[in-house]
Amino acid sequence: APGDLLWSDEFDGAAGSAPNP
């Protein structure tokens, strides 16, 4: 989801999202 920094763009597709642990 947009603004979601907890999941990688593989799931939310949001630019700037960090890779999940």
From Swiss-Prot:
The reaction(s) this protein catalyses: Hydrolysis of (1->3)-beta-D-glucosidic linkages in (1->3)-beta-D-glucans
Chain spans, region Disordered: 1-21
Keyword Hydrolase: yes
Documented EC number(s): 3.2.1.39
Keyword terms, alphabetized: Glycosidase, Hydrolase
Domain of life: Eukaryota
UniProt GO MF annotations: glucan endo-1,3-beta-D-glucosidase activity
Catalytic class of the enzyme: hydrolase
Protein name: Glucan endo-1,3-beta-glucosidase 2
Source species: Papiliotrema laurentii
